[in-house]
Amino acid sequence: MLVISIVATILVSCTTETENGGFSLEKVNDTLYNVVLETDSSRDVWELRFPVYRFCTGDMDGDSIVDAVVGVEKTTRFDPVVRRRVFMFRNIEGKVRPLWMGSRLGRPVVDFNVVNVDGETRLRSVEEDDNGKFLVAEYRWSSFGVKFIRYICRDFEFDDSMEILNNE
C-alpha cells in the first residue's frame, strides 16, 4: 500500500488546482491502475487496464468541477501500435465518468501537463513531429474533445521541449 501512495504522489505533481477535486491514482500492478474519486460520503473507482505515464487534475471543461487527466499507453481499434494517449475523466455526482478518451492529439504524444493560462485550464503537450524533432502544443476543451490552440515551440530537441513543458 505504501508503493501506491508514493506513485500517486509523484504522478499528481502536475495538479494545477489547490486541491485535486478528490481524484487520485492507485497503482495495482504495472498494467492495472485505478482512477479514484473520493468525496465526503463516497469512493468510486474507474479501472484502467493499461500502463499509466502521467496523472494530472484540473477543470478541463470549464464547469468549475475538477477533472482527472490520465496518460495511458495502449493501442486503439484504428492504431495497433502501443502509443501514449490522453484520457479525461469527470466527477458526475461522485462517480468517475469518461469525459474524453483521446486516441491522439495532433502528433504522437510524448508527455503532457495541465496548465492555467489566463484563468483557463489547458492541456499542454510535447509531441514528436514528422521530422523527428519535438514540439510543445497547447489545447483547450471544446464540447467533445480538445481543440488545438497554439504551438509554443517547434523543431526543438527532446530535452528542450520537456524543459519548456515542465517550466511554463
Each model region followed by its residue ranges:
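Bacterial N-terminal signal peptides
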Residues: 1-10
